[in-house]
Amino acid sequence: MDKIIKSIAQSGAFRAYVLDSTETVALAQEKHNTLSSSTVALGRTLIANQILAANQKGDSKITVKVIGDSSFGHIISVADTKGHVKGYIQNTGVDIKKTATGEVLVGPFMGNGHFVTIIDYGTGNPYTSTTPLITGEIGEDFAYYLTESEQTPSAIGLNVLLDENDKVKVAGGFMVQVLPGASEEEIARYEKRLQEMPAISHLLASKNHVDALLEAIYGDEPYKRLSEEPLSFQCDCSRERFEAALMTLPKADLQAMIDEDKGAEIVCQFCGTKYQFNENDLEALINDKA
């Protein structure tokens, strides 16, 4: 089962979140049938939103939109504070690797654009923030958002490793943040350790990448595990929700679906689930509108 572990240095100087998001990203790949680059881009966005949601309280919903002007198009993810996330990528078929190394490429195919977050606290006044894409690699763009929008300098690592068949092998990430009150000496030590950390892809390839991430972040510094919480890809779509959407259409449009298509099929963008509405279903909706 996927999980996020929240921890804090014994000194109180900084905190870290580490994530295993392998099943989340694998299920997203399965539902959307994404090719290599699209899988990694979508996966990184889902992991970023899992981190962002873990930072919220109450019943907030967090939407992350990575909007680029190149091959991927846009990536949309929605998460809640209970560990659930869903998402999709506009172009599922991007499959580009470096010839020499086989490394999956993401940044060059995100293009210019924006990292948008919408935090809905359930009060009717969602908070929206937009920052420019810095590299298109998503991790760096997320870190820039945290620094610029939330005024919280953060170190971020996100990645998805694929097997020889381009299926998700492992996915995860981390966030490290300096806390108020940290001394200059503690900040310098933390920055040095982060600079010396192995690449996120190397750490994810470890036998137990969650422990490898924690060890790389803290080194010999004592720390406390504050909590371990489950994560999952879960869509909250339903037939009732799409039926309500159909009810907002004019009667003429519903009648056209009956006359021309003998019904309607609605596909959820976030999970690919198909909902069928036959002629009788649509006629019932028309009668309900009368």
Curated annotation (Swiss-Prot):
Reported modifications of this chain: Under oxidizing conditions two disulfide bonds are formed involving the reactive cysteines. Under reducing conditions zinc is bound to the reactive cysteines and the protein is inactive.
Main location class: cytoplasm
Lineage: Bacteria, Bacillati, Bacillota, Bacilli, Lactobacillales
Alphabetized NCBIfam families for the sequence: PRK00114.1
Gene Ontology MF term list: protein folding chaperone; unfolded protein binding
Any one of the GO BP annotations: protein refolding
Record carries keyword Nucleus: no
Family recorded in the similarity comment: Belongs to the HSP33 family.
CDD domains for the chain: Hsp33
Disulfide bonds: 235-237, 268-271
A single cellular component GO annotation: cytoplasm
General function of this protein: Redox regulated molecular chaperone. Protects both thermally unfolding and oxidatively damaged proteins from irreversible aggregation. Plays an important role in the bacterial defense system toward oxidative stress.
Keyword Zinc: yes
Keywords, in A-Z order: Chaperone, Cytoplasm, Disulfide bond, Redox-active center, Zinc
Localisation: Cytoplasm
InterPro entries noted in UniProt: Heat_shock_Hsp33, Heat_shock_Hsp33_C, Heat_shock_Hsp33_N
Record protein name field: 33 kDa chaperonin
